[in-house]
Amino acid sequence: MQAKASANMVRLAPRKARLVVDLIRGKQVGEALSVLAHTNKAASPVVEKVLKSAIANAEHNYDMNIENLVVTEAYVNEGPTLKRFRPRAMGRASRINKRTSHIHIVVTEK
């Protein structure tokens, strides 16, 4: 049985969020939480929140044992991009892309 959790439209660049998600894929849930707690990246608290949500879903919806949970799938997809403009010299403007991410985590019982 699988338990899933996701966070959509998170204001993090997908490339930076993938660095954090790659650290927890395939690990036990307790180990993954400790890795996230000691990772000094902006995406760590967001990924930790999604992982805790997946754990809560597994426990509440499917009566799974938390000690046996493993992160089987963890991936980040690109969300919509917010486009902003920054004024530059001589009346010009440059476009700034503010990227968003969709973070998905799936846990299963081992």
From Swiss-Prot:
GO terms for cellular component: cytosolic large ribosomal subunit. Transmembrane segments: none annotated. PANTHER family: CHLOROPLAST 50S RIBOSOMAL PROTEIN L22-RELATED, LARGE RIBOSOMAL SUBUNIT PROTEIN UL22M. NCBIfam families: rplV_bact. Gene3D superfamilies: Ribosomal protein L22/L17. InterPro entries: Ribosomal_uL22, Ribosomal_uL22_bac/chlpt-type, Ribosomal_uL22_bac/org-type, Ribosomal_uL22_CS, Ribosomal_uL22_sf. This is Large ribosomal subunit protein uL22. It holds the Pfam family Ribosomal_L22. GO terms for biological process: translation. Disulfide bonds: none annotated. This protein binds specifically to 23S rRNA; its binding is stimulated by other ribosomal proteins, e.g. L4, L17, and L20. It is important during the early stages of 50S assembly. It makes multiple contacts with different domains of the 23S rRNA in the assembled 50S subunit and ribosome. The globular domain of the protein is located near the polypeptide exit tunnel on the outside of the subunit, while an extended beta-hairpin is found that lines the wall of the exit tunnel in the center of the 70S ribosome. Part of the 50S ribosomal subunit. The keyword Membrane does not apply. One of its GO terms (molecular function) is structural constituent of ribosome. Keywords: Ribonucleoprotein, Ribosomal protein, RNA-binding, rRNA-binding. The gene is rplV. It comes from the Bacteria. Belongs to the universal ribosomal protein uL22 family. It comes from Exiguobacterium sp. (strain ATCC BAA-1283 / AT1b). HAMAP family: Ribosomal_uL22_B. PROSITE patterns: RIBOSOMAL_L22 (PS00464).
